[in-house]
Amino acid sequence: MKIELAKSYGFCFGVKRAIKIAENSKNASTIGELIHNSLEIDRLKNNFNVKTLKDISELKNEKKAIIRTHGITKEGLANLKSRDVEIIDATCPFVTKPQQIVEKMSSEGYEIVFFGDINHPEVKGVMSYSSKNVYVILDESELETVKLPSKIAVVSQTTKKIEKFTKIVSYLMQRVKEVRVFNTICNATLENQEAVRELSSRADVMVIIGGKNSSNTKQLYLISKNLCPDSYLIESENELELKWFQNKKLCGISAGASTPEWVIQNVINKLENLTHKDS
């Protein structure tokens, strides 16, 4: 069986930047998980004593607080600034962008339609910057019962699928007088999605590596599953099962934006050992 990596996969700019910040901030604490990958979170804790707090209320005698890649709410930032703690901002610049857009557009009288998961920390953070109504949706059908205003600005969670975003935009363009569209899906997300789409259309088994709570990894898995029914989402090599690869000729591999290279390599090594023993 041949193993092929997607043309674009793994760590994105924002995650690489955040990891470097954390490694240079020994003994700091992150407000929430720095990234959605438990294995990398454990490595940072073990090697750099970077701890994870659930929220700001858990801050006690910590000297340094790191803001996670997904950002923080406007109120949370004000709370942090009121404390005697050094603030280290690891928010991805691509997440800061929709925060700024939402703050500006709402101040100009636009209500916000936000394509995203309402419980995701990135979405909570961006929402908090709006002074107007924010409609957080995953599907355009959720707007059918909403009395839409005459002015709307549309943004997306950075890790969502572009196809769905364009459907939502199209729906609004047909019903709202003035629609301002901001494509805030980041380039790394688009490139990884396009690469997994291409590979899964050829492979007869796909392995997507990443945190189960990672939005961008989940999107890669859904794209892959649609084109290659034998697609599997795993966090580490320990989840691989030999039966997935029996009688398969091409195994495609992709990984989420918060999946470190060492985890990906462990999966490839285990996969090669598994299939070698079986041959």
Swiss-Prot record:
Residues annotated to bind (2E)-4-hydroxy-3-methylbut-2-enyl diphosphate: 36, 70, 120, 158, 214-216, 258
Single annotated GO MF: 4-hydroxy-3-methylbut-2-enyl diphosphate reductase activity
Reactions catalysed: isopentenyl diphosphate + 2 oxidized [2Fe-2S]-[ferredoxin] + H2O = (2E)-4-hydroxy-3-methylbut-2-enyl diphosphate + 2 reduced [2Fe-2S]-[ferredoxin] + 2 H(+); dimethylallyl diphosphate + 2 oxidized [2Fe-2S]-[ferredoxin] + H2O = (2E)-4-hydroxy-3-methylbut-2-enyl diphosphate + 2 reduced [2Fe-2S]-[ferredoxin] + 2 H(+)
Cofactor: [4Fe-4S] cluster
Binding site for [4Fe-4S] cluster: 12, 92, 186
Signal peptide positions (record): none
Biological processes, Gene Ontology terms: dimethylallyl diphosphate biosynthetic process; isopentenyl diphosphate biosynthetic process, methylerythritol 4-phosphate pathway; terpenoid biosynthetic process
Pathway info: Isoprenoid biosynthesis; dimethylallyl diphosphate biosynthesis; dimethylallyl diphosphate from (2E)-4-hydroxy-3-methylbutenyl diphosphate: step 1/1; Isoprenoid biosynthesis; isopentenyl diphosphate biosynthesis via DXP pathway; isopentenyl diphosphate from 1-deoxy-D-xylulose 5-phosphate: step 6/6
Enzyme Commission (EC) number: 1.17.7.4
Keyword annotations from UniProtKB, A to Z: 4Fe-4S, Iron, Iron-sulfur, Isoprene biosynthesis, Metal-binding, Oxidoreductase
Cofactor note text: Binds 1 [4Fe-4S] cluster per subunit.
Binding site for isopentenyl diphosphate: 36, 70, 120, 214-216, 258
Binding site for dimethylallyl diphosphate: 36, 70, 120, 214-216, 258
InterPro entries tied to this protein: LytB/IspH (IPR003451)
Keyword Ribosomal protein on entry: no
Function: Catalyzes the conversion of 1-hydroxy-2-methyl-2-(E)-butenyl 4-diphosphate (HMBPP) into a mixture of isopentenyl diphosphate (IPP) and dimethylallyl diphosphate (DMAPP). Acts in the terminal step of the DOXP/MEP pathway for isoprenoid precursor biosynthesis.
UniProt-listed PANTHER family: 4-HYDROXY-3-METHYLBUT-2-ENYL DIPHOSPHATE REDUCTASE
Family: Belongs to the IspH family.
Protein name: 4-hydroxy-3-methylbut-2-enyl diphosphate reductase
Gene it is expressed from: ispH
